[in-house]
Amino acid sequence: MKIAVDGMGGDFAPKEVVAGCVDALNENKDLHIVITGKEELIKKELEGHNYDEDRIEVLDAREVISTNDSPVMAIRRKKDSSLNKGLQLVKEKKVEGIISAGSTGAFMAGSLFIVGRIKGIDRPALAPIMPGKNAPFMVIDVGANAECKPQNLLQFALMGKIYFEKILNVKNPTIGLVNIGVEEEKGTELTKEAYKLLKNSGLNFIGNVEPRDIPTGDVNILVCDGFTGNTILKTYEGVAQNIFEILKAEIMSSFQGKIGGALLKPSFKNIKKKFNYKEYGGAAFIGVEGICVKAHGSSDRKAFKNAIKQCINFHKGNIINNIKEELVNIETLH
């Protein structure tokens, strides 16, 4: 498998990007990587690593898209950017997929304009796997589509189901619709109409799910518009971070707390690992004609390595072709 990695995207590029690529390369003997970005900077970072030189290429790109750039304008104007060049490789089928920790807006815009949508999918969606109390779960969409139609939510559910089955090996995953109550008649016109479509779709739809029940992980896939999903994602991240900080402050506030903290240190480490985004790689942008994974902006080498692993699993699961086949089978999507 061959993938492109945006060497200039993210808070710690290119150092952590390159390190993550090397780690992934050394763990996967059939993997080839093209790192796009400023050639001299990337090659300088590569000098400190041991790797198979035949399996890493550097594609020079002189421009960088920043988070301050207008996403659409940057994709149109910065043709020589590391992100643009990587996306072009996907479009030309020279690589199977791309990973970037750069601007989310530019990544999604570029994936749409350059790589293109799967025929029959109206709107691709951003879908991270998130840690839950009992099991990991997916939220789809978390920001690609602030406003949606009921049919969009049905397509999100379909794409999420295929992705979840292949990546987490869960057969016929449960699907819930994020809403303010569990009753069928609750919610906006969007959720009411989406409920009807999901109920009759043949998917394993279990009904509405209230936000307070999301963190359990008892429902595999949570479907919502991108505005709602982004709010869930950022609230989840913020609450988790604050809980760890509060726990740390309480433990350090007394002698007894320090003793208790020392005894519970292994448990705290396990919990922290479970809620660490680095363990999950990135969010897949599902519904485009290529594997597009958006890594967290502050990704380190471990996060990049896991994002690459995610790409590999996406490829092995043949997810794009599976989505195309499922579109033919479900008449309500047409």
Curated annotation (Swiss-Prot):
It is found in: Cytoplasm. Coiled coil: none annotated. InterPro entries: FA_synthesis (IPR003664), Phospholipid_synth_PlsX-like (IPR012281). It catalyses: a fatty acyl-[ACP] + phosphate = an acyl phosphate + holo-[ACP]. Transmembrane segments: none annotated. Pathway: Lipid metabolism; phospholipid metabolism. Its main location: cytoplasm. It comes from the Bacteria. Its EC number is 2.3.1.274. One of its GO terms (cellular component) is cytoplasm. Belongs to the PlsX family. NCBIfam families: plsX. Catalyzes the reversible formation of acyl-phosphate (acyl-PO(4)) from acyl-[acyl-carrier-protein] (acyl-ACP). This enzyme utilizes acyl-ACP as fatty acyl donor, but not acyl-CoA. HAMAP family: PlsX. This is Phosphate acyltransferase. It comes from Clostridium tetani (strain Massachusetts / E88).
